[in-house]
């Protein structure tokens, strides 16, 4: 996978009617185009550089796993960040005091709303059978 960031894409040469592949396979081309257009590899490369520097300086390296809204993991140099206990959720943020979520409906073919959260709770009415006593045998 060497050097796919420094080299460019394959170049079309008309006199040979072909594309010059300078040691490129389809995966490296995909990686180049992805990092070229989205810039995700810049963050990865920056993290890799920091990793390389820390490997040289023998610092206590901690990788904080990425949270769902952060696309790439942060590098924490001091390990005290991991010793902080996580925040306790206060009872005000508990789900019992929140307003109930609206049922996620679905507009069906007859243009009427289906509510899957409500239709799940529909119970089939049980047929009440009058209880009959066992026939008492005469003494």
Curated annotation (Swiss-Prot):
Family as reported in the entry's similarity comment: To M.pneumoniae MPN_091 and MPN_463.
Compositionally biased intervals (Low complexity): 86-98
Region (Disordered): 83-109
Domain of life: Bacteria
Protein name: Uncharacterized protein MPN_413
Lineage, broadest ranks: Bacteria, Bacillati, Mycoplasmatota, Mycoplasmoidales, Mycoplasmoidaceae
């Amino acid at each position: 996978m060497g050097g796919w960031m420094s080299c460019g894409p394959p170049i079309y040469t008309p006199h040979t009617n072909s594309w010059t592949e300078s040691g490129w396979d389809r995966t490296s081309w995909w990686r180049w185009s992805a990092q070229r257009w989205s810039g995700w590899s810049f963050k990865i490369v920056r993290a890799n550089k920091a990793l390389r520097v820390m490997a040289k300086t023998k610092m206590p390296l901690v990788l904080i796993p990425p949270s769902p809204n952060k696309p790439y993991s942060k590098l924490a140099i001091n390990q005290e960040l991991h010793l902080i206990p996580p925040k306790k959720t206060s009872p005000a943020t508990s789900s019992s005091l929140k307003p109930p979520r609206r049922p996620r409906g679905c507009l069906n073919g007859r243009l009427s709303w289906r509510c899957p959260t409500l239709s799940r709770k529909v119970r089939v009415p049980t047929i009440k059978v009058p209880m009959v006593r066992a026939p008492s045998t005469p003494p």
